[in-house]
Curated annotation (Swiss-Prot):
GO cellular component: cytoplasm
Gene: fosB
Task performed by this protein: Metallothiol transferase which confers resistance to fosfomycin by catalyzing the addition of a thiol cofactor to fosfomycin. L-cysteine is probably the physiological thiol donor.
One of the record's GO molecular function terms: transferase activity, transferring alkyl or aryl (other than methyl) groups
Protein name stated in the entry: Metallothiol transferase FosB
This protein's UniProt keywords: Antibiotic resistance, Cytoplasm, Magnesium, Metal-binding, Transferase
EC number(s) stated in the UniProt entry for this protein: 2.5.1.-
UniProt xrefs under InterPro entries: Fosfomycin_Res_Enzymes, Glyas_Bleomycin-R_OHBP_Dase, Glyas_Fos-R_dOase_dom, Metallothiol_Trafse_FosB, VOC
Residue positions binding Mg(2+): H7, H66, E115
Pfam families: Glyoxalase
PANTHER family (alphabetical): FOSFOMYCIN RESISTANCE PROTEIN FOSX, LYASE, PUTATIVE-RELATED-RELATED
Length: 139
């Protein structure tokens, strides 16, 4: 039986740039560094970075695949400004219904898509039940 997410590992082209991003911008706690690796605790998750300089990274820009972190509504403006102040690549978000809450989509230095979201799974399901009758819901 699966218990939980164990860790998330990102391949990065420059370990120092990525350490700066995850520690100094996203405020992750740096746990260890090695020649080609760094571990963080971020939002209760173990985030691993492995430096791999010679792999293609072009396809990542065409995918909606991302990791979303929860933030409070009251912190939305703070985080948006923090990302802007640190010249983070903020992506154009999709048009949202207010019931779907707020999100900021952005990328790390290697183009991995991340999201800061103010909603919960329950918010999303309730919104979809109200607004999307074509969807099938299971218990």
């Amino acid at each position: 039986m699966l218990k939980s997410i164990n860790h998330i590992c990102f391949s990065v082209r420059n370990l120092n740039d990525s350490i700066h991003f995850y520690r100094d911008i996203l405020l992750g706690k740096l746990l260890l560094t090695g020649k080609k690796t760094a571990y963080f605790k971020l939002a209760g998750l173990w985030i691993a970075l492995n430096e791999e300089k010679d792999i293609p990274r072009n396809e990542i820009h065409f995918s909606y695949t991302h990791i979303a972190f929860t933030i409070d509504d009251s912190e939305f403006k703070y985080w948006h400004q923090r990302l802007k102040d640190n010249n983070v690549n903020i992506l154009e978000g999709r048009v949202r219904d207010i019931r779907d809450r707020q999100s900021i989509y952005f990328t790390d230095p290697d183009g991995h898509k991340l999201e800061l979201h103010t909603g919960t799974l329950e918010n999303r399901l309730n919104y979809y039940k109200e607004a999307k009758p074509h969807m099938t819901f299971y218990k």
